[in-house]
Amino acid sequence: NDKVLYHYLGFLFFNFKAQTPFRDIYTQWKALNSRDKFLKDIQHTIATRMLDRYLEETEKAAPDYQKCLKTMTEAISDFRENWYNNDKELYQILILLDIFRILDSKSIKKLPTDYFTRKSGQKDGEDKEHILSQTPRKDNGEITTIKTDWEKFVQSEDFKDIRSQMQDILNHSDAELTEQELIQLQNLLNSAGLNSIGNMALLDLRINRSYGNADYTHKRTIIFQEYMNQKYVRPHTLAVFMKGDIDAREATGIPLNRWTLEDIKRNTDKIAKEIGKNFNAWLTQNN
């Protein structure tokens, strides 16, 4: 019945099974005989497990986790960092963001046990989703190689800062783009933040495939309809598609029905600060 312990223990068990035998955790609980001390130990363990990947081999004997945390938050806050192929860490951070939202709310229900990791499976699994579409795609989900599709794509207001560079590539291309030209275009998009963690969310495959290569407004509508129809949508995913931080939105004047490069930068910065704040607290609270 302890909402906080449920979520942090669940995250630890499901994401670090090999390093976290249940017997060891139970022994730890009995030895401490204090809920608060036990929680602090669990949070500290989560932070160190996630930061271990930033340790050099020579640092493992005497790890400096604050140094690792600095490296981690810098990687998160750099909106040009490519997180798309960093699946394990990406999923863990996105799921922690779900947990933070749940624990900060009195109304959001507990995370179902099968959502402590990315759900796999062809029918009821999940996949990482670009909030702002990364590239123009065909109906089957493949990246289009048709020049006119790309020319239409780059006219979006979202790409105004890199439009001239993208258009320069397209001006020198034939009706069908070469592999090299596609790589050049994708590299430009990545430099603008399309593969940053601030443009990523975990979404049910069924929902993801239901709207194909739709724009943000259409994605937003479908996700909201699914949520209203009692389909489970992760709290962090719902928040970014519903743009829950209304106050910040009103202050910047960015419209609610678009997800812009400015949104990506803002979300990236928010995630870095949230992870940094929590991990720093977890690392120091036992000192």
List where the protein language model places each region.
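Flexible coil/loop and intrinsically disordered segments
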Residues: 1-287
